[in-house]
Amino acid sequence: MSGENICAVRCEIFILHRRHLPYDEEWLLDTARRKDWLKPEGTPLYCLGNLLAYSGMFVSRKYNSTLEDIRHAIQIDNDVVVGVDREKLYAEEVDLEDLTNHAVVVTHLEDDSVTIFDPYQEPYISKIPLADFLHAWNESHNYMIQVLQSVDEYVPHPINVDNIPLAGDLEELEEAIAENAHDVWAKARMEEGWVYGKERDDERKEHPDLVPYTALPDSEKEYDRQMAFNTIKLVKKLGFDIVKRNG
């Protein structure tokens, strides 16, 4: 365990403890490693909360979150974990690069400060100036997970990508993603025993869309294209570049 970045696991353990739920730390760590949620450099954002979900809790994830999102979650007694650049949280730390390298639990929010549980800080519970918290949180695109009390609290929050422009040369990629998504879906259905039928029949496992992508009705093609379109825009929204190699 020496040198291993397990801050996310400890944040999830903190929540299990706060909710008076039984846990075994070594088992949780072993599970996270075995399922590749815990990597040598730490837990990726997209795996944050997986141990809680694996333990039967309902975990909702969101990019571009706001302080109001955190405030509302705390008010209804939900737990909040955020991804941050740890060195930006503390004035005495040397911040050598901009990156998301840490997870903390937000336990209280005031007008000028944020109280957090930081598993790598003494004491574990610290009050951070609001400006420092926002600076550190911004590195993860304001990523947070919220641990719900029940599934009834779940509200979908797709990332808004309306303001992301796409170059015309990405149309080929958009169409390729759309057609591939259809092929992936069709292959999975066929492996489950589904066949083509003029109308959907769940008992007979017949589906009218089990045809080549080119034979799909325009409405279904548009659904796949919109998914591809939003996927490409999401990639750009989160700071990734799409580069086409020659050859």
Annotate the PLM regions.
Residues W37-E41, A91-E93, E97-D98, T107-E153:
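Noncatalytic regulatory segments and standalone regulatory/sensor domains
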